[in-house]
Amino acid sequence: MALWRAYQRALAAHPWKVQVLTAGSLMGLGDIISQQLVERRGLQEHQRGRTLTMVSLGCGFVGPVVGGWYKVLDRFIPGTTKVDALKKMLLDQGGFAPCFLGCFLPLVGALNGLSAQDNWAKLQRDYPDALITNYYLWPAVQLANFYLVPLHYRLAVVQCVAVIWNSYLSWKAHRL
């Protein structure tokens, strides 16, 4: 519990920094899980650069974009009623999620050195499956998140659930 209290104090003092660092850390953890448990690479074959790429994406893209999106969404649809949460989830999953995945997957491809043509082909191959898989997990998570969780904790809650999602995304994004 002391760790949780320290996190809350840090979040209160430096909300943006803590949210971004949380996203980066949990993106990295998702990649480690992907490489070790899904792909079964072992420590000798672990691609540290790939993990650092995912941490960087978490800090430089996922944290700021998702954290910013939650702020915009809360301004656009203020309130925490069940109806408000449903509206937020529908906007999130109907508008934001498809765009986010459409940016995330090619960004990883570009960071991994794929040519524009290869990146486009990979996006065409992987995007539909990633989006469909997204819809198995995220609508229920986001509905609960928007209804039960205060704004300043939403990114952290989502990123905790997203450790598993990040493992999937890392595997999907790095699969050739």
UniProtKB/Swiss-Prot annotation:
Tissue: Ubiquitous. Expressed in pancreas, kidney, muscle, liver, lung, placenta, brain and heart.
Main location: mitochondrion
Effect of mutating residue 93 to P: In MTDPS6; results in altered ribonucleotide incorporation in mtDNA from patient fibroblasts
Disulphide bonds in the chain: none
Membrane topology: Multi-pass membrane protein
Listed GO MF terms: channel activity
GO biological process, one term: homeostatic process
TM region positions: 18-38, 53-73, 94-114, 131-151
Mutagenesis / variant outcome for changing residue 99 to A: Does not affect conductance and gating properties of the channel
A cellular-component GO term for this protein: peroxisomal membrane
Keyword Mitochondrion tagged: yes
Residue(s) at site: Determines ion selectivity: 92
Function of the molecule: Non-selective channel that modulates the membrane potential under normal conditions and oxidative stress, and is involved in mitochondrial homeostasis. Involved in mitochondrial deoxynucleoside triphosphates (dNTP) pool homeostasis and mitochondrial DNA (mtDNA) maintenance. May be involved in the regulation of reactive oxygen species metabolism and the control of oxidative phosphorylation.
Family of this protein: Belongs to the peroxisomal membrane protein PXMP2/4 family.
Annotated disorder: Mitochondrial DNA depletion syndrome 6: A disease due to mitochondrial dysfunction. It is characterized by infantile onset of progressive liver failure, often leading to death in the first year of life, peripheral neuropathy, corneal scarring, acral ulceration and osteomyelitis leading to autoamputation, cerebral leukoencephalopathy, failure to thrive, and recurrent metabolic acidosis with intercurrent infections. Charcot-Marie-Tooth disease, axonal, type 2EE: A recessive axonal form of Charcot-Marie-Tooth disease, a disorder of the peripheral nervous system, characterized by progressive weakness and atrophy, initially of the peroneal muscles and later of the distal muscles of the arms. Charcot-Marie-Tooth disease is classified in two main groups on the basis of electrophysiologic properties and histopathology: primary peripheral demyelinating neuropathies (designated CMT1 when they are dominantly inherited) and primary peripheral axonal neuropathies (CMT2).
Name assigned to this protein: Mitochondrial inner membrane protein Mpv17
Lineage of the organism: Eukaryota, Metazoa, Chordata, Craniata, Vertebrata
